[in-house]
């Protein structure tokens, strides 16, 4: 922008960076358990996700909800991320002809990780992950941008339902 004649103070740049949120990149949807969505769907993004897991979640129990598209770097994403998970739930990204079926993804994950379960729907994955997770655990949903919007809606629905239950007390 400076090349175009705009004068921007360094403090404004720093403030902008500090206050910028990147939806779908380590986006926290719930705090107890910590429920995070991340758009990691290829080798580069999976490497960045692995770095973030190491930095932020060392010594945390982590449950993945993982869904991939067939034409992505499935083997590399699995190789870079599987070692951080205690449990991996695989899902089929809905409404996408390129979606890898949850059972096929589970078969690939099972080659390197012993605790993998294919789940029939995103709703079931969200519910099961919450049943498996303790208050201080991490649920991390990633693998394809194509279903993160659906996860956001499901989590909003859970939050609304939870608020209604609290209001009735």
Residue ranges with predicted function:
Residues 93-96, 162-169:
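Short, flexible loop segments at boundaries between secondary-structure elements
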Residues 1-87:
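Nucleotide phosphate-binding/pyrophosphate-handling subdomain across enzymes
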Residues 144:
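Active-site-proximal loop/hinge segments that shape catalytic or ion-binding/gating pockets
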């Amino acid at each position: 922008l400076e090349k175009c004649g705009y004068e921007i103070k360094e403090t404004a740049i720093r403030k902008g960076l500090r206050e910028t949120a990147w939806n779908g990149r380590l986006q926290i949807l719930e705090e107890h358990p910590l429920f995070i969505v991340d758009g990691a769907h290829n080798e580069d993004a999976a490497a960045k996700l692995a770095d973030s897991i190491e930095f932020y979640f060392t010594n945390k129990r982590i449950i993945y909800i993982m869904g991939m598209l067939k034409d992505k770097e499935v083997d590399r994403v699995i190789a870079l991320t599987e070692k951080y998970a205690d449990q991996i739930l695989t899902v089929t990204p809905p409404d996408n002809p390129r979606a890898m079926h949850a059972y096929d993804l589970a078969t690939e994950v099972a080659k390197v990780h012993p605790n993998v379960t294919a789940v029939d729907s995103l709703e079931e994955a969200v519910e099961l992950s919450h049943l498996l997770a303790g208050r201080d655990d991490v649920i991390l949903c990633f693998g394809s941008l194509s279903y993160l919007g659906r996860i956001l809606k499901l989590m909003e629905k859970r939050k609304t339902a939870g608020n209604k239950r609290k209001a009735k007390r």
